[in-house]
Amino acid sequence: MIKIGAHMKISKGFTKVPPDTANIGGNTFQIFTSSPRVWKVNPPKENDVEGFKNAMTEFNINFEDVLVHSSYLINLASPKDDIREKSITAMIEEIKATDQLGILHYNFHPGSHLGEGEEFGINKILEGLDIIFKEVQNTKVTILLENVAQKGSNIGYSMEQLGRIINKSPWKERLGITYDTCHGFDSNYDIRKKEEVQRLLDEIDKYIGLNKLKMIHLNDSKYDVGAAKDRHEFIGKGYIGREGFKTFLSFDEISKLPLILETPGDDPEHSQDIKVVKEIFKELGKL
């Protein structure tokens, strides 16, 4: 069974997300818990939580298959103490909101060291995660590190880097990863080629463990492999292309996972992208 959906707006309330997902042909989704551009996190209201959970059941969406994405402001690797402190506080509140909604996975970008060096950044991420987990250890939420584009001082563009963070953490059992196809393509994982998809899976298995690969951000790229631009494109319309995604999704280790679109546009465009992905699954004999 295909698990496919998109990043959905919460502006109409959490309760509307499951029906809106079904309307575009999806059965999974990603949301923010609050505005991603401010530090303040507003916890969901009790009636919103109840309505959301009822809608999830009504539209047969599995809580394990959906994802909360962190605020854009968060940077656990920052050399600035105030930014790290704000990031830690925001993540704690967002994870508590995730747990309230019954969602089991929370996704964040590891961060940028801003010139202080990779080792500095990784140590700060580990310190931050330790503080966060001590505050949210009674929740059921797994924190997923997302691979990022290999640009600037970003941390987490390679599976080896993500593995170093996860394996050094005392909270390893509560950590996993989301793989973003555009970010990976930016970082020279050329998933248009079978041998490159196999290399990716081998690296995940070696450095992290394939069991920790929980979600896929399915995005085409406006730029060619290794460009490090982080510009998402509609499925099949970018440099990865329809055939590239067919190669990528031919691997059962990937096609069995929830596939979340972060492509441009809104519900109509996401509906079209979902149709394209379903067509690819049919061509592969998986639907």
Curated annotation (Swiss-Prot):
What is catalyzed by this enzyme? Endonucleolytic cleavage to 5'-phosphooligonucleotide end-products
Q: Name one GO biological process term.
A: base-excision repair
Q: Which PROSITE patterns match?
A: AP_NUCLEASE_F2_1 (PS00729), AP_NUCLEASE_F2_2 (PS00730), AP_NUCLEASE_F2_3 (PS00731), AP_NUCLEASE_F2_4 (PS51432)
Task: State where Zn(2+) 2 binds.
Answer: E146, D180, H217, E262
Q: Which residues bind Zn(2+) 1?
A: H69, H109, E146
| GO terms assigned for molecular function | deoxyribonuclease IV (phage-T4-induced) activity; DNA binding; DNA-(apurinic or apyrimidinic site) endonuclease activity; phosphoric diester hydrolase activity; zinc ion binding
Taken from the record, one Pfam family name reads: AP_endonuc_2
Q: Where does Zn(2+) 3 bind?
A: H183, D230, H232
Cofactor(s) the protein requires to work = Zn(2+)
Question: What keywords were assigned to this record?
Answer: DNA damage, DNA repair, Endonuclease, Hydrolase, Metal-binding, Nuclease, Zinc
Q: List the disulfide bonds.
A: none
Enzyme Commission number:
3.1.21.2
Statement: the UniProt record of this protein carries the keyword Cytoplasm: no
Q: How is the cofactor bound?
A: Binds 3 Zn(2+) ions.
| Function per UniProt | Endonuclease IV plays a role in DNA repair. It cleaves phosphodiester bonds at apurinic or apyrimidinic (AP) sites, generating a 3'-hydroxyl group and a 5'-terminal sugar phosphate.
HAMAP family the UniProt entry points to:
Nfo (MF_00152)
Family assignment from sequence similarity:
Belongs to the AP endonuclease 2 family.
Listed name of the protein: Probable endonuclease 4
- The gene it comes from is nfo
